[in-house]
């Protein structure tokens, strides 16, 4: 994997907002690469969506994405720039 710094987006969908505390803890561990975040709860259901703008190397962003994706009831997709 390349150590080039890349800009990207991570989309997180929670089937149950009960996972929010775990998500927030993991995102906090990677605060050095998280440049912005937005959370949108669905008040009709217990679900929600979080968007992260990230800037970092592939290894770090991949690790963040993997940890989030391993949470129960959480789906994660990411897109990164080819180069900065």
Predicted regions and their residues:
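Long, contiguous binding/interaction regions
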Residues: 1-84
């Amino acid at each position: 994997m390349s150590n080039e710094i890349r800009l990207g987006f991570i989309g997180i969908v929670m089937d149950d907002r009960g996972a929010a505390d775990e998500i927030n803890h993991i995102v906090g561990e990677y605060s050095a690469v998280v440049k912005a975040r937005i959370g949108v709860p669905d008040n009709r259901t217990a679900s929600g969506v979080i968007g992260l703008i990230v800037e970092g190397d592939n290894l770090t962003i991949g690790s963040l994405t993997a940890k989030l994706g391993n949470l129960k009831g959480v789906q994660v997709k990411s897109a990164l720039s080819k180069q900065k």
